[in-house]
A protein has these predicted regions:
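Acidic, low-complexity/disordered tracts enriched in E/D and polar residues
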Residues: 1-35, 39
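Long, charge-rich, low-complexity alpha-helical segments
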Residues: 29-85
Length: 85
């Protein structure tokens, strides 16, 4: 998995994140959780398991729960044309 080429990603002071594609005027807004998941994936070279482990330590949360949430979120981003496999 990786982002499609040419994305523009902007993180706001509120913790929300805006993702835009070069071929569309649409924008995708992510809340603080989505922003944290995006950053974790970037830091872990888009390896889901490593990003889950990092977030579960940071949030002191069940890694399986985080993995489920991330998989749902990744599916949404893939459907939106932001991520590719």
């Amino acid at each position: 998995m990786e982002p499609v080429p040419g994305l523009s990603v902007r993180v706001f002071d509120t913790g929300w994140m805006e993702i835009t594609r070069p071929d569309s005027a649409d924008r995708l807004l992510c809340d603080e959780m989505g922003t944290a998941m995006w950053i974790a994936l970037c830091q872990e070279s888009w390896r889901l398991g490593d990003a889950v482990a990092s977030l579960s330590r940071t949030w002191e949360a069940d890694p399986w729960s985080i993995r489920d949430q991330m998989c749902d979120w990744i599916a949404d981003l893939t459907d939106a044309g932001v991520l590719q496999h």
